[in-house]
A protein has these predicted regions:
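Phosphate-binding site recognition
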Residues: 1-422, 437
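Active-site metal-binding core of divalent-cation-utilizing nuclease and nuclease-like domains
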Residues: 136-140, 433-459
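Structural motif
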Residues: 145, 461-463, 497
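Mg2+/Mn2+-dependent nuclease catalytic core
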Residues: 165-170, 469-486
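Metal-dependent nuclease catalytic cores in nucleic-acid-processing enzymes
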Residues: 175-182, 335-343, 431-435, 479-499
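Conserved catalytic cores of phosphodiester-cleaving nucleases, focusing on short active-site segments
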Residues: 430, 452-469, 483
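Domain-level recognition of nuclease-like catalytic cores that cleave nucleotide substrates
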Residues: 488, 492-519
């Protein structure tokens, strides 16, 4: 039986190595990066191993050879020189006031000044930072290594607060600008974050920064690949399958469906979310481990603010320029959602340079769509999961009347804000409901110009539904018959329901449905 200790939530490389935690060797890629450049930026979703990568770099630049015993870099590195390191972690503060950023910068600068001395004439954060870099280089006789974890956390937390975001930007831009000013004293700089802010970037002065976020050669630098699972966790896969009472192949398929699917460039291999994957191995159970550690409230607010058509999210198309930049004034919520890890690259059109996006895996898709429901429908967060269970039971038992009455209750008490965009609201609610039902039954969903048609299949029943806005239920049913939507099921023995539904803008609800049955 395997006795691996999984480093869940542990981001300190030294602790992982000294205390015998499981570690997947990323040091060959790290070494390649160090030897082929000086300034790097990497964006990955939260809990994807960015902090551990920084901690690994820190141990390497401290010359702690003993920690790398048995790892690839042990044979690659000959010198193991110790460099002065300035490690700034912006992850530990909640940025709700301009002082919160000032406090954390001041705290770090003060700690470094105790090591390398202070100069009274250096009043601003950027001057103090530049002075520290210069003095550290002189004192140590080696150039300085700078590591910044979650450089963008203040900016992300201020999305929607234009004034605060501007203050943070005005503080961070000159601060990071010191990296360019002090280039001669810097050996290596690595900044990580979830996002890359565009035109108004705090990096606009740092044009020598290599953004490796979409470089194919560094796809595996964070996260876990299928190859790495089989090379490092083969015994554990068999134990996991036995504990679940399923075959090895079935387990691999379920792990892939739940946690794989992150693509950070076109034609790249899929990466597994390490946080969810290691939790699943530790507990020998499937859960929404990553999703539950952070709620995407600010993303949902962005979607609502920009009146976004949710159905588009499953096949959104965009180019690299949009994907890679977040402009605080932008009306497009997609880059933030992509960079936060709720969407990923699903395809690429080489001719036009367009990326097709979608949800990476079931954990994210189901978690995100479930999370949306209380924001769009008349249902609270506590009741929400039970409502979906009831929907599923009703369609499985052929009880379409209860199903539609429940759907009506979702549209009750629609706010005035939503009324302004009636059609989009009703499409969004139906998309969420049928997407969630689709995790338990087969659903094909199509929408165009104010009408929605869908086919929902269970073991015993087939439902063909046509939804109209401000038409009649009779017209909707007629459409099903005129377009021969039931034709593919002619020989099917399951009971078939054709249902025409009308949604009234006046009552802001489902006004009527009529059903035609075929046994």
């Amino acid at each position: 039986m395997s006795h691996k200790i999984y480093p869940i939530g542990i981001q300190n490389f030294e602790k992982i190595r000294n205390d015998g935690y499981f570690y997947i060797d990323k040091t060959a890629l790290m070494y390649q990066m160090v030897k082929t450049g000086s300034y790097y930026f990497l964006s990955r979703p939260r809990r994807f191993g960015k902090s551990l990568l920084l901690s690994t770099l820190e141990a390497y630049f401290q010359g702690k050879k003993e920690l790398f015993e048995g790892l690839a870099v042990e044979k690659l590195e000959k010198d193991w020189i110790k460099y002065p390191i300035l490690h700034l972690d912006l992850n530990i503060e909640k940025y709700d006031t301009s002082e919160s950023l000032d406090n954390i910068l001041d705290k770090s600068l003060t700690a470094w000044e105790k090591l390398y001395g202070a100069e009274p004439s250096e009043r601003s954060f950027s001057l103090r930072f530049a002075g520290i870099i210069e003095r550290a280089c002189k004192l140590a006789g080696q150039r300085v290594v700078i590591l910044v974890d979650e450089y963008d956390k203040p900016m992300l937390q201020a999305i929607g607060n234009e004034e605060l975001q501007k203050q943070f930007r005005n503080t961070l831009k000159p601060f990071y600008g010191a990296l360019k000013t002090m280039d001669g004293c810097i050996k290596f700089a690595f900044l990580t974050g979830v996002t890359k802010f565009g035109k108004v970037s705090v990096f606009s002065d740092l044009n020598n920064l290599d953004d490796i976020s979409m470089w194919n050669e560094y796809v595996e630098i964070c996260g876990i690949s299928e190859r790495e699972i089989h090379n490092n966790l083969e015994t554990e896969l068999h134990e996991f399958a036995a504990a679940r009472g399923i075959t090895y192949d079935k387990l691999c398929e379920e792990l892939r469906e739940c946690y794989d699917g992150y693509h950070f460039t076109h034609n790249s291999i899929g990466m597994y979310n390490p946080f969810s994957l290691l939790n699943a191995f530790k507990r020998k159970d499937f859960g929404s481990y990553w999703f539950e550690t952070g709620t995407p409230t600010y993303l949902v607010k962005l979607l609502q603010k920009h009146h976004y058509d949710l159905e588009r999210m499953t096949h959104e198309e965009t180019d690299a320029q949009v994907l890679n930049s977040i402009d605080s004034e932008s009306t497009n919520p997609i880059p933030v959602i992509y960079q936060s890890g709720y969407l990923t690259i699903k395809g690429y059109d080489e001719e036009f340079g367009m990326y097709r996006l979608g949800f990476p895996n079931r954990e994210v898709e189901e978690g995100f769509v479930r999370f949306l429901l209380p924001y769009y429908a008349n249902v609270n967060k506590v009741e929400s999961p039970f409502e979906i269970q009831k929907f599923v039971r009703e369609v499985r038992s052929g009880d379409y009347s209860s199903f539609f009455r429940r759907l009506q209750s979702f549209f009750a008490d629609t706010t005035y804000e939503v009324i302004r965009d009636q059609e989009l609201h009703y499409e969004n609610v139906l998309f969420i409901v049928f997407k969630l039902v689709g995790f338990y039954a087969k659903v094909e969903y199509h929408t165009s110009e104010g009408r929605i048609d869908l086919v929902l299949q269970t073991d015993k029943f087939i439902y063909i539904m046509e939804f109209k806005l401000n038409g009649t239920a009779e017209e909707a049913l007629q459409q099903i018959n005129d377009k021969h939507y039931a034709l593919p099921f002619e020989m099917d023995e399951r009971k078939l329901f054709k249902i025409g539904v009308n949604f009234s803008a006046e009552t802001r609800n489902i006004e009527k449905w009529i059903v035609e049955t075929k046994n």
